[in-house]
Amino acid sequence: MNDSQYNLIAEALLLAIEEAIEDSGVDIDYEGVGGLLTLTFKNNSKVIINKQAPLHEIWVATKFNGHHFVLNNDSWTDKRSGEEFWQFLSNAVSTQAETELTLSAQ
């Protein structure tokens, strides 16, 4: 994957996250700027998702830890655990929002 392809795919992922948050109906504020998406919850905790263009990765920082995701066969997966991105994000957001929800790309 070249840099242009990465940027298109990563930007599409960030947009899909915004749309999934909006569609969830849960009160989560989000702000995206320059490849960085910040989710802010009622309890003032945050999840920060950002592009790491030089590495062709997506990094996610939660209240508890950080994760690096790489694109494998059209699916973003955690470099350490192998967990799929949307499953991980659903769990992280559910924990920090203190309500169960499932996020996915539309």
From Swiss-Prot:
GO terms for molecular function: ferric iron binding; ferrous iron binding. GO terms for biological process: iron-sulfur cluster assembly. It comes from the Bacteria. SUPFAM superfamilies: Frataxin/Nqo15-like. Involved in iron-sulfur (Fe-S) cluster assembly. May act as a regulator of Fe-S biogenesis. GO terms for cellular component: cytosol. It comes from Colwellia psychrerythraea (strain 34H / ATCC BAA-681) (Vibrio psychroerythus). Keywords: Iron, Metal-binding. This is Iron-sulfur cluster assembly protein CyaY. It holds the Pfam family Frataxin_Cyay. The lineage of its organism: Bacteria, Pseudomonadati, Pseudomonadota, Gammaproteobacteria, Alteromonadales. Belongs to the frataxin family.
